[in-house]
């Protein structure tokens, strides 16, 4: 079996072990119901709703994934925007109530975080939970990632694999200065935008505005507007027959993903990763980015001045880069075995995992032995159907052994933008005035497909997003 064939089968084996089953979703539904019962019993939370978000809503969670929950406070039909002081007060109340009633372990109230969070583990189910107040932004971002699943089903598979790989290399832990899962999902989006041919467009073509800023007024109206714009543009993008299909296998996409970020520690000094524009952006092009710059800047496509990777420290950025380099070296080596690949791509407990056996959640959160039985139920099917299949196999532009410096990428760019310079779609240098690069180019509804010599005569195509 060739190196890519062995890698492909190993990745599929890992996916079978980490993909949630129907019972895993039902377990999280029960945790939400238990918390809802507690919240509704408290006078201070009268009229509040308990709503999940994060990977559970976007269908990007694994069998051991944490559960993000937002308690939405009543504000008539309008979007609630409680002050941070009130959020802290209510979470502190909930903290004391849960501790008193029992059934909730490892309670921790993080009051000084940007978003105050109450963390705990549901004792009956062994599920780790993060609870916040009025986190509608998180809910809408989660729904957007779910909608992206409609474009190409390989997106979900890549996110699950990348998250497991990152955990295996201890770089998926924001509390200790590495990447959070949302940042890892954005890296996968960015890779799908810059691979050749591109699988995803710049996200500004799916929603051209700042999504978080548009969450105001009547909640139902705001949510419906965002959903209509996104789903319309996604459908239009998928139906564009002039778009070159990308039929790369999962293994080819994974290897090129690892190669793309091997020198992320070097690029991060002056470049930010921007899924909104689908390209690397010079940090000097936006003074607000410079003011908020950390060791690594990943532009939140739904809140463009925010950096989801702000917790990454300089030392850990080197660690993250080394994980990419080490993994790339092993993936392109000629002496791969199943066991060596598993040791590189997954945590030790994944290796012998029986996908139809009991899921011991406490094994991963430090609780006493709490075993949850996941029977031989069919694999969970989400209420949104994933898009085009990612299992087809064709040749890929990336060849084993190529260094990141020699790899080229296929990018979608606005018509008014000039050709990108350098490797990995390096952007043009900013103007001396340091103008925001989003504003420098005309916001033409069309975008240009940059072609390479192996695709002669393809020329330019247009695709118009809904404003």
Model-derived segments and spans:
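Composition-driven recognition of long, intrinsically disordered, low-complexity regulatory extensions
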Residues: 336-467
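Eukaryotic intrinsically disordered and solvent-exposed regulatory patches
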Residues: 35-38, 53-58, 102-106, 114-117, ...
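Residues that form ligand- and interface-recognition hot spots within folded domains
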Residues: 39, 43, 49-57, 61-64, ...
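Pol beta-like nucleotidyltransferase catalytic core
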Residues: 3-11, 190-375, 426-429, 461-467
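Intrinsically disordered, low-complexity regulatory regions enriched in Ser/Pro/Gly/Thr
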Residues: 33, 41-46, 60-65, 87, ...
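Basic, alpha-helical interaction scaffolds
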Residues: 140-181
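N-terminal regions immediately upstream of nucleotidyltransferase
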Residues: 1-64, 73-89, 109, 140, ...
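Conserved catalytic core of two-metal-ion nucleotidyltransferases
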Residues: 42, 87-139, 157, 168, ...
